[in-house]
């Protein structure tokens, strides 16, 4: 592809510059190869302009940069633009070309992974070759690629979308994080519909205020969705009204789900230990659903996913039937096993205040004994949430064990102390493996254990090293050791 063939560059690269052949695109100078277009982006830790000369030496044939970015003596055309992140994403979309025919995106603080996964499963039930992209990876009929980035960078994203389309995927659901939206990573994705789950405290190390955080989320509706496109919004969150207003002002076709929903109205929920009986109204029809997942938040996620599926071609009755077959996303109230007495042990990705509150509230209805929680907070992230999560844990759980999460560059003991300051009666066990084994060993009949914070992750970040660690594997090992001891 020639540089001039990328629409945005027709005027930016006139004459000979436009005839340059582009063989690849990247914003990482270390990945540049001969013929690449390099985007010199300003980041939190580094300015891509510093690496422009190195990119040119490695073979970059043109450079994208901000209008206020000075790049001297690069030896290749430098294309100065108002929004280099947007231009990078659009260039990547045009370079790779193909996308699944039906693309949807879901934003919100919690539930994105589950909604994207559930939407894929409903589509698959209806006969569509479908995929989902997000925190746990890329999943389709031909692949299960695990990773840990909610919204991939635009070059990687558009490469994956092109591959999925080439593999026959026609429908794809993706997560839209506030970082991804703010950094224009989804620009160029041809979206058919979008969704909003909820909003709570998260990424306060990145967004200055909750209003700024909400504004980043709403970019899905006011910048990415075409006018008239369906916007599925969970109606029962404290920020639902703001989301509805933003989507309406953006010209979206707003459809709400939940107890206050006008598209899918939740009428009744009955909780059991591992499933829930749900009644919903769609138009004039009433549907009875046996949802094979625990937790009120999973009902919300399932309804948002059903809404997305219905506005993209799945009949209501088929979508409701599919809900009875849903499998939870990895690490989302994921039942690892149970003790010899039947007490269940879950792992959950809850690493934000509202998510921790949701999961602990969700297991209470089917817990006849104690709710036991093991959790910590990540280093180099929003410090303000630590005492908030400590208070939530001590208020909603009967036994609280505070441990290490991903301390990163911070001193683990300091992180724990900030949680413990508000976690009345909590026990502190820094070693996460020991904390999990301790929690499993104290379980009694009727108890429920939740190990929260890391969910599907397969490593623990200490300093700049990622050590192998899986909450799921450690809980399973602790349950096995307990059973072995019981059988002696």
Curated annotation (Swiss-Prot):
<dbReference type="InterPro" id="IPR000713">
    <property type="entry name" value="Mur_ligase_N"/>
</dbReference>
<dbReference type="InterPro" id="IPR004101">
    <property type="entry name" value="Mur_ligase_C"/>
</dbReference>
<feature type="binding site">
    <location>
        <begin position="108"/>
        <end position="114"/>
    </location>
    <ligand>
        <name>ATP</name>
    </ligand>
</feature>
<dbReference type="GO" id="GO:0000287">
    <property type="term" value="F:magnesium ion binding"/>
</dbReference>
<dbReference type="Pfam" id="PF01225">
    <property type="entry name" value="Mur_ligase"/>
</dbReference>
<dbReference type="Pfam" id="PF08245">
    <property type="entry name" value="Mur_ligase_M"/>
</dbReference>
<feature type="binding site">
    <location>
        <position position="177"/>
    </location>
    <ligand>
        <name>UDP-N-acetyl-alpha-D-muramoyl-L-alanyl-D-glutamate</name>
    </ligand>
</feature>
<dbReference type="GO" id="GO:0051301">
    <property type="term" value="P:cell division"/>
</dbReference>
<feature type="binding site">
    <location>
        <position position="185"/>
    </location>
    <ligand>
        <name>UDP-N-acetyl-alpha-D-muramoyl-L-alanyl-D-glutamate</name>
    </ligand>
</feature>
<dbReference type="InterPro" id="IPR035911">
    <property type="entry name" value="MurE/MurF_N"/>
</dbReference>
<comment type="pathway">
    <text>Cell wall biogenesis; peptidoglycan biosynthesis.</text>
</comment>
<feature type="binding site">
    <location>
        <begin position="150"/>
        <end position="151"/>
    </location>
    <ligand>
        <name>UDP-N-acetyl-alpha-D-muramoyl-L-alanyl-D-glutamate</name>
    </ligand>
</feature>
<keyword id="KW-0132">Cell division</keyword>
<dbReference type="InterPro" id="IPR005761">
    <property type="entry name" value="UDP-N-AcMur-Glu-dNH2Pim_ligase"/>
</dbReference>
<feature type="binding site">
    <location>
        <position position="457"/>
    </location>
    <ligand>
        <name>meso-2,6-diaminopimelate</name>
    </ligand>
</feature>
<dbReference type="Pfam" id="PF02875">
    <property type="entry name" value="Mur_ligase_C"/>
</dbReference>
<keyword id="KW-0133">Cell shape</keyword>
<dbReference type="GO" id="GO:0009252">
    <property type="term" value="P:peptidoglycan biosynthetic process"/>
</dbReference>
<feature type="binding site">
    <location>
        <begin position="405"/>
        <end position="408"/>
    </location>
    <ligand>
        <name>meso-2,6-diaminopimelate</name>
    </ligand>
</feature>
<protein>
    <recommendedName>
        <fullName>UDP-N-acetylmuramoyl-L-alanyl-D-glutamate--2,6-diaminopimelate ligase</fullName>
        <ecNumber>6.3.2.13</ecNumber>
    </recommendedName>
</protein>
<comment type="similarity">
    <text>Belongs to the MurCDEF family. MurE subfamily.</text>
</comment>
<keyword id="KW-0963">Cytoplasm</keyword>
<dbReference type="InterPro" id="IPR036615">
    <property type="entry name" value="Mur_ligase_C_dom_sf"/>
</dbReference>
<feature type="binding site">
    <location>
        <position position="381"/>
    </location>
    <ligand>
        <name>meso-2,6-diaminopimelate</name>
    </ligand>
</feature>
<feature type="binding site">
    <location>
        <position position="453"/>
    </location>
    <ligand>
        <name>meso-2,6-diaminopimelate</name>
    </ligand>
</feature>
<feature type="modified residue" description="N6-carboxylysine">
    <location>
        <position position="217"/>
    </location>
</feature>
<dbReference type="InterPro" id="IPR036565">
    <property type="entry name" value="Mur-like_cat_sf"/>
</dbReference>
<keyword id="KW-0961">Cell wall biogenesis/degradation</keyword>
<dbReference type="GO" id="GO:0005524">
    <property type="term" value="F:ATP binding"/>
</dbReference>
<dbReference type="GO" id="GO:0008765">
    <property type="term" value="F:UDP-N-acetylmuramoylalanyl-D-glutamate-2,6-diaminopimelate ligase activity"/>
</dbReference>
<keyword id="KW-0573">Peptidoglycan synthesis</keyword>
<feature type="binding site">
    <location>
        <position position="183"/>
    </location>
    <ligand>
        <name>UDP-N-acetyl-alpha-D-muramoyl-L-alanyl-D-glutamate</name>
    </ligand>
</feature>
<feature type="binding site">
    <location>
        <position position="29"/>
    </location>
    <ligand>
        <name>UDP-N-acetyl-alpha-D-muramoyl-L-alanyl-D-glutamate</name>
    </ligand>
</feature>
<dbReference type="GO" id="GO:0071555">
    <property type="term" value="P:cell wall organization"/>
</dbReference>
<keyword id="KW-0067">ATP-binding</keyword>
<feature type="short sequence motif" description="Meso-diaminopimelate recognition motif">
    <location>
        <begin position="405"/>
        <end position="408"/>
    </location>
</feature>
<keyword id="KW-0460">Magnesium</keyword>
<dbReference type="GO" id="GO:0005737">
    <property type="term" value="C:cytoplasm"/>
</dbReference>
<dbReference type="GO" id="GO:0008360">
    <property type="term" value="P:regulation of cell shape"/>
</dbReference>
<keyword id="KW-0547">Nucleotide-binding</keyword>
<comment type="function">
    <text>Catalyzes the addition of meso-diaminopimelic acid to the nucleotide precursor UDP-N-acetylmuramoyl-L-alanyl-D-glutamate (UMAG) in the biosynthesis of bacterial cell-wall peptidoglycan.</text>
</comment>
<dbReference type="InterPro" id="IPR013221">
    <property type="entry name" value="Mur_ligase_cen"/>
</dbReference>
């Amino acid at each position: 592809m020639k540089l001039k063939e990328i629409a945005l560059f027709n005027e930016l690269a006139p004459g000979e510059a436009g005839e340059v052949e582009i063989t690849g695109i990247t914003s990482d100078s270390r990945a540049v190869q001969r013929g690449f277009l390099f985007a010199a982006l300003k980041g939190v830790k580094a300015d891509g302009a510093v690496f422009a000369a190195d990119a040119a030496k490695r073979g970059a044939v043109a450079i994208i940069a901000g209008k206020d970015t000075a790049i001297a003596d690069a030896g290749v055309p430098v294309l100065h633009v108002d929004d280099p992140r947007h231009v990078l994403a659009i260039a990547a979309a045009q370079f790779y070309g193909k996308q699944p025919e039906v693309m949807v995106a879901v934003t919100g603080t919690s539930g994105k992974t589950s909604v994207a996964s559930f939407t894929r499963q409903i589509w698959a039930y209806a006969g569509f070759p479908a995929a989902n992209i997000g925190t746990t990876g890329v999943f389709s009929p031909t692949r299960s690629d695990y990773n840990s980035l909610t919204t991939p960078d635009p070059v990687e994203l558009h490469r994956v979308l092109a591959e999925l389309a080439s593999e026959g995927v026609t429908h794809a659901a993706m997560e839209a994080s506030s970082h991804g939206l703010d950094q224009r990573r989804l620009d160029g994705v041809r979206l058919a519909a979008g969704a909003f789950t909820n909003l709570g405290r998260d990424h306060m190390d990145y967004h200055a205020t909750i209003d700024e955080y909400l504004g980043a989320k709403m970019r899905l509706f006011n910048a990415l969705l075409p006018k008239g496109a369906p916007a599925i919004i969970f109606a029962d969150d404290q920020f639902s009204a703001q989301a509805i207003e933003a989507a309406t002002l953006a010209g979206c076709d707003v459809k709400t789900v939940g107890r206050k929903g006008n598209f899918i109205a939740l009428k009744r929920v009955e909780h059991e230990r591992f499933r829930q009986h749900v009644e919903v109204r769609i138009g004039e029809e009433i549907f009875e659903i046996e949802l094979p997942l625990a937790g009120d938040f999973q009902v919300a996620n399932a309804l948002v996913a059903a809404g997305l599926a219905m506005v993209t071609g799945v009949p209501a009755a088929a979508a409701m039937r599919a809900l009875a077959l849903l499998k939870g996303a990895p690490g989302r109230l994921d039942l690892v096993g149970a003790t010899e007495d039947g007490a269940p042990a879950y792992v959950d990705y809850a690493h934000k205040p509202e998510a921790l509150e949701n999961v602990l509230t969700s297991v209470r209805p089917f817990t006849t004994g104690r709710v036991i929680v093991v959790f910590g907070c990540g280093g180099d992230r929003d410090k303000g949430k630590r005492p908030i999560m400590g208070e939530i844990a001590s208020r909603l759980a009967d036994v609280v064990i505070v441990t290490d999460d991903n301390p990163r560059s911070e001193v683990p003991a300091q992180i724990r102390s900030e949680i413990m300051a508000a976690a009345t009666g909590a026990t502190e066990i820094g070693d996460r493996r020991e904390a999990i084994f301790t929690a499993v060993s104290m379980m009694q009949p009727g108890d429920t254990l939740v190990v929260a914070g890391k969910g599907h992750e397969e490593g623990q970040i200490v300093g700049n090293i990622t050590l192998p660690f899986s909450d799921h594997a450690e809980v399973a090992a602790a349950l096995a050791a307990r059973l072995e001891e019981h059988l002696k």
